[in-house]
Amino acid sequence: MEQPVIPVRNIYYMLTYAWGYLQEIKQANLEAIPGNNLLDILGYVLNKGVLQLSRRGLELDYNPNTEIIPGIKGRIEFAKTIRGFHLNHGKTVSTFDMLNEDTLANRIIKSTLAILIKHEKLNSTIRDEARSLYRKLPGISTLHLTPQHFSYLNGGKNTRYYKFVISVCKFIVNNSIPGQNKGHYRFYDFERNEKEMSLLYQKFLYEFCRRELTSANTTRSYLKWDASSISDQSLNLLPRMETDITIRSSEKILIVDAKYYKSIFSRRMGTEKFHSQNLYQLMNYLWSLKPENGENIGGLLIYPHVDTAVKHRYKINGFDIGLCTVNLGQEWPCIHQELLDIFDEYLK
């Protein structure tokens, strides 16, 4: 069974939703990209992002700078000053703050460009653009990037567009692995990893609902087990139930479970059935939900379309249950409209 076939442009759109940067989708003309894989798209978007930031003016910040200078400025480094006999010449080794472009965000961007340039299968035009941008950042140092560098920027003062560019950097860095040639990289085959794509699919659908279903409230709900024990310690061992998506409209509470599988069906003794564990999980969520004012409650299992388009609706144990697919292989405006139609139908 093949995995869902999703064009790389649509994977980029899904990433942009998952990162929370819906507005930036419109700023990248993906039709103009010379390459044809996800790395080429991300490299193209990064180049355009760095160019736009440079035109706006890269962010500045005060950074400690140590120099041999005439007189005194800031803090004197006494040991270095005495050891170098600088006082004999009326000079000191001083450390003082200097306003420049050598900030953490800019270092991350330049360091990512350095990695991008060394990718073995990157489109040559995109590589040349990245190399040109790298050379235009001489006052910015590079880093051996780690997850901690990106975590330092979370919630920082960077502008929204800076944060978008950093998100692209983070994805490129996290999916760059050593290539066959020393000092080079190859891009991890992200879209072929079912676990990674499943996480992306869940995040994408959550952000889509949160941003596009403006008349409803989209959250992730934490549900409590209807359980008792002789000790609180025993209860604490129970796993936490968290929904992928909970949508509350004026008419209904809809719990959505996003499942990214090679097939929506399991086969046993020659007969196709929906995956039982998915339906059991959804039903458990519904049984655990405690409506406060007699709200109408329903559930929806939504899969990517692989080989069969599915749209079914049932009444199970008094709950309105839907199982459907969305075709992620079509043009993006069609995906957008299909999802709106699905949620509009199942929220009624």
Swiss-Prot record:
GO molecular function, one term: type IV site-specific deoxyribonuclease activity
GO biological processes: DNA restriction-modification system
This protein's GO CC annotations: endonuclease complex
Superkingdom: Bacteria
Record-linked InterPro entries: McrC, McrC_bac
UniProt keyword list: Restriction system
Role: Modifies the specificity of McrB restriction by expanding the range of modified sequences restricted. Does not bind to DNA.
Name used for this protein in its record: Type IV methyl-directed restriction enzyme EcoKMcrBC
Name of the gene encoding the protein in the UniProt record: mcrC
